[in-house]
């Protein structure tokens, strides 16, 4: 029989290789490993390809990635696509989540689950994170049965299930405008940027702020704001720049965003701003301001 090949998170090795500076070697290795995509062998008895279909999932789009050079007939679906055959497949729908909670007599906590684990929007579907919902039910079902309702908590499960070292490639390369965008997101607002749908890990060395925000969208820290993003922007082909609006999907991700992204990047922004002020003070010969800045830096960054 012909086989279906399922490959989840195909680009994780590429992301780790980028962080440890052996990306080219990993591209060579994976190109060889995925060689069957380019030339599938045929069954000598049926004369049909051994592999019927391959399904890959990953953070970044597969079409332009260098490991897929020579691969044809790729059908790509991203977080901005409107193909409704796929929009409800990536997680639990609202109806599926409510049914699960009812099955375990935990429907009274549907609002808690919605606030913490809902919020992703894929065109026409509102999606819950399955990992979060299942863990919430498993961890709290016994408390519900025993009447210990005060013990029921919405834990942060996403923080322990994801790692995006590629995001930190942008430390020191973002602007004050990007810092403000982070604050806007944490405050519950949407921000806009030019989406790079064809980015791959080769692009990280360019440190384009738009790629930074694109990466956060692709890795789940953000979700598309379909109401604010103009339809004609999403209708553009992949060679065109698309201005999109994004937001943080829920309370769980907001906590992760503040701890993983904003906190780490904000410290760099502070150092960068002090550096600029120090250069200006020295250039102008302003002794008092130079002294004040040095004193501030010593207090912040030196243990005496």
Task: Locate the predicted segments by residue.
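Conserved P-loop NTPase "ATPase switch" module shared by AAA+ and STAND
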Residues: 2-23
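Extended alpha-helical interface modules used as scaffolds for assembling large macromolecular complexes
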Residues: 74-75, 79, 128-134, 140-304
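Substrate-engagement module of ASCE P-loop NTPases
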Residues: 25-52
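Aromatic- and carboxylate-enriched substrate-binding clefts and catalytic-loop regions
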Residues: 23-28, 53-54, 59, 69
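Structural recognition of the conserved hydrophobic beta-strand(s) that form the central parallel beta-sheet
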Residues: 4-8, 32, 52-59
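Phosphate/oxyanion-binding active-site loops and adjacent basic polyanion-contact surfaces
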Residues: 22-30, 93, 209-212
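Amphipathic alpha-helical segments of the small helical/lid subdomains adjacent to P-loop NTPase cores
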Residues: 64-71, 77-138
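Residues immediately C-terminal
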Residues: 12-15, 39, 62
């Amino acid at each position: 029989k012909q086989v279906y090949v399922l490959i989840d998170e195909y680009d994780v090795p590429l992301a780790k290789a980028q962080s440890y500076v052996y990306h080219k070697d990993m591209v060579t290795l994976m190109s060889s490993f995925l060689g069957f995509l380019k030339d599938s062998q045929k069954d000598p008895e049926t004369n049909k390809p051994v592999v019927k279909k391959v399904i890959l999932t990953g953070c970044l789009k597969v079409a332009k990635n260098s490991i897929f050079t020579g691969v044809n007939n790729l059908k790509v679906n991203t977080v901005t696509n409107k193909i409704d055959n796929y929009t409800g497949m990536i997680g639990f729908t609202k109806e599926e989540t409510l049914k699960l909670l009812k099955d375990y007599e935990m429907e009274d906590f549907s609002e808690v689950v919605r606030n913490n684990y809902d919020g992703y929007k894929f065109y026409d579907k509102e999606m819950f994170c399955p990992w979060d919902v299942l863990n919430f039910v498993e961890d709290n079902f016994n408390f519900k049965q025993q009447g210990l309702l005060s013990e029921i908590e919405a834990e942060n499960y996403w923080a322990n299930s994801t790692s995006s070292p590629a995001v930190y490639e942008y430390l020191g390369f973002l602007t004050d405008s990007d810092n403000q965008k982070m604050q806007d997101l944490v405050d519950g607002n949407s921000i806009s940027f030019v989406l790079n749908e064809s980015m791959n890990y080769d692009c990280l060395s360019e440190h384009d702020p738009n790629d930074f925000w694109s990466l956060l969208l692709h890795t789940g820290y953000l979700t598309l704001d379909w109401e604010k993003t103009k339809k004609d922007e999403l209708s553009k082909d992949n060679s065109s720049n698309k201005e999109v609006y994004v937001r943080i999907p829920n309370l769980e991700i907001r906590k992760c965003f503040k701890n993983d992204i904003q906190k780490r990047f904000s410290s760099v922004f502070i150092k960068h701003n002090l550096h600029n002020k120090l250069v200006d003070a020295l250039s102008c010969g302003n002794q008092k301001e130079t002294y004040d800045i040095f004193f501030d830096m010593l207090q912040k960054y030196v243990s005496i």
